[in-house]
């Protein structure tokens, strides 16, 4: 067990709560100095997760005493209401705060999260769209909107979200790989999208050569393309070239790329035994 609450993973809320209780009992919280406020927030969330609402309220009170009416503290109180009161009470609280300050981003996001948890997907989508009209640069909000679109199988809308994220972070390989994933899904009904999927996977490994997700995606795309008949492959390639001006690889290039992706995957597997086991299942 770590002796620092801040180093305990958020996925271990019981350990966080136990360590806090121990250190508080032995008056060891002073060692955190200015980081004590991060400790209180971490313990607050962990306590809500484990159902220890008395401890959660105590942590919130200390944060509120120090940062009264701050956006972060008000957002945490909304989380407390979600866990201890009714959804209606929490929503009323969020609406009240937004009527005071429509630009309160923390509260706005908490409200949207609550809408999603309540199954009000359409309202959540519209709320995120409205939010992004004002706060376009919020990558987290774009990712949330994309995730919701994927959950309702609106893959083309999800692609739009990731394309917007790419504009904000053009050198993030994970975004291009995710675009590759989405085009791969669309390719199940329209094989032309294998080319677009391949293009984005290739861009992800161009940015980061050691990015396994990208190489694995390349191997899957190439495998699908090589299983097509030569006539069908040429027909798809002509369709792709009609849509965009990019030069896509020919059949031989796809074959070479496939072999390269397999070699790369083998190298990753040699370094990571667990990854090797997963690859053997694919």
UniProtKB/Swiss-Prot annotation:
Q: Which gene encodes it?
A: oca3
Q: Name one Pfam family in it.
A: TPR_EMC2
Q: Subcellular localization, per the record?
A: Cytoplasm; Nucleus
Task: Describe where the TPR repeats fall, as residue ranges on this chain.
Answer: 16-50, 71-104, 139-172, 174-211
Protein origin, superkingdom: Eukaryota
GO biological process per UniProt: protein insertion into ER membrane
What is the name listed in the Swiss-Prot or TrEMBL entry for this protein? Answer: TPR repeat protein oca3
Chain ranges passing through the membrane: none
